[in-house]
Amino acid sequence: MGQGLGVETAEVWMFDQTSSVGGHTTQVLGHPQVIETPLGKAVQFNGVDDALFVPVHPLAGAATWTWEVIFRPDADGAPAQRFFHLSVLDPATGKDTDDRLLFETRIVNGQWCLDSFAMAGGQSKTLLNCDKLHALGKWYRVTAVYDGTTLRNYVGDELQGEGSVRLVPQRPGHSSVGVRINLKDHFKGAIYEARFTRRALTPDEFLKMPTPH
């Protein structure tokens, strides 16, 4: 699954069960379902109360990084949904801080656009381009890349947006899948795979979409 990347630089989470992802035991909220899809097994979220919490921040400590998710946003979800959230925890209190990485969708006129957000050390950047709309109910790979100076996001290999920002490395924390970390803005759809790489990849290095079967 590493596709030539060293195991020390990339971590892969396959969503083929709900009790663990990427070797990490999950906290299951609601009743997310393992489903069979043309790509293989995936986890489906109902957009109401389904979520998985994972007790790690897979990009903590990375000065540059690439975050990829293969997912399917459904047609009848809420207008704004948070489908993946990496959150930094305060080591003194154990509470969530404002430092975070987020993947979100916005539904506009029956289609969706990608919203990516990154914040660390008081600096932040939002990438949201709803001029680039995509059909709901299909499988996509979305990607956020930070190269040390610029944050970029992609749907497939197509750049959606970019902006300059200076982000210090994220500190340790945890992750939520299917909802924002504060249990708001649930996601309706399915997630097949995520990959977290501790360097900035170019589009030709991005995770390959599996062949439907």
Describe each model-derived feature in a short phrase.
Residues 115-141:
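Short, aromatic/His-centered strand-loop micro-motif at the edge of beta-sheets
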Residues 138-152:
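Localized edge beta-strand/strand-to-loop motifs within extracellular or lumenal beta-rich domains
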Residues 54-57, 128-133, 164-166:
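Beta-strand-rich interaction surfaces with strong enrichment in secreted/lumenal proteins
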Residues 154-158:
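Short strand-turn-strand beta-turns centered on an Asx-Gly dipeptide
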Residues 163-191:
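Flexible glycan-contacting loops in extracellular carbohydrate-active proteins
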Residues 4-25, 33-36, 46-115, 136, ...:
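Extracellular glycan-recognition modules
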